[in-house]
Swiss-Prot record:
It is found in: Cell membrane. It is a single-pass membrane protein. This is Potassium-transporting ATPase KdpC subunit. PANTHER family: POTASSIUM-TRANSPORTING ATPASE C CHAIN (PTHR30042), POTASSIUM-TRANSPORTING ATPASE KDPC SUBUNIT (PTHR30042:SF2). Belongs to the KdpC family. Keywords: ATP-binding, Cell membrane, Ion transport, Membrane, Nucleotide-binding, Potassium, Potassium transport, Transmembrane, Transmembrane helix, Transport. GO terms for molecular function: ATP binding; P-type potassium transmembrane transporter activity. It comes from Myxococcus xanthus. The system is composed of three essential subunits: KdpA, KdpB and KdpC. It comes from the Bacteria.
Length: 211
């Protein structure tokens, strides 16, 4: 019986060392060697080298001179510690009322936008932290951004087109635009908005309220 116990103990210790120490160290080492940026959280820095967020976690931009992301049901909105969807079903009256309110707000804030309001801008993602928009949804907001920044619409559209990411490996997903990276590109191209600049809701330059 004692030999059986020793065998079990040795097996337990070896397994703990392999799976709890050596394997995590090997994976961490390879990740740091091959793709250190992604392994460390895909941090995004501004022009002064300050970390302003992660490329993987959306932020709730609301100022008129920035592109806005999808609505978020994560905490008070884009709370990285409270990732979740709304859990409202297609027959939910609350969902219908919220979508109607979003539609009204978006039409009011984007009077020069061409075409109907994109569905993305009135629906939350499953995680509540989606950092991307479709290129079409970003372009729909371009007129508001151009007006708020006092630049030509074509110049803002050029920034959007330059930030479009293609399908992963050429086949997975759809073309998309990272909202945080897009707004940082706006600041690099046209300069950051002054802190006192009027906003739609009054918040959020890149990094303000960053996760």
């Amino acid at each position: 019986m004692f030999s059986t116990f020793l065998t079990a103990l040795r097996t337990c210790v070896v397994t703990m060392v392999l799976t709890g120490l050596l394997y995590p160290l090997a994976v961490t080492g390879l990740a740091q060697l091959l793709f250190p940026g992604e392994a460390n959280g895909s941090w995004v820095k501004d022009g002064r080298g300050r970390v302003v967020g992660s490329a993987l976690i959306g932020q709730g931009f609301t100022r008129a001179g920035y592109f806005h992301p999808r609505p978020s049901a994560a905490g008070a909105g884009y709370d990285g510690a409270a990732s979740s969807g709304s859990n409202l079903g297609p027959t939910s009256l609350k969902l219908k009322e919220r979508a109607a309110a979003e539609l009204e707000r978006l039409r009011r804030e984007n009077p020069d936008a061409a075409g109907p309001v994109p569905a993305e801008l009135v629906t939350t993602s499953a995680s509540g932290l989606d950092p991307h928009l479709s290129p079409e949804t970003a372009r729909w907001q371009a007129a508001r951004v151009a007006r708020a920044r006092g630049v030509a619409l074509e110049r803002v559209l050029d920034v959007v087109d330059a930030r479009v990411e293609g399908r992963t490996f050429g086949v997975l997903g759809e073309p998309r635009v990272n909202v945080l990276l897009l707004n940082l590109a706006l600041d690099r191209r046209f300069g950051p908005l002054p802190d006192a600049a009027p906003g739609v809701g009054g918040r959020a330059s890149p990094g303000q309220g960053a996760p």
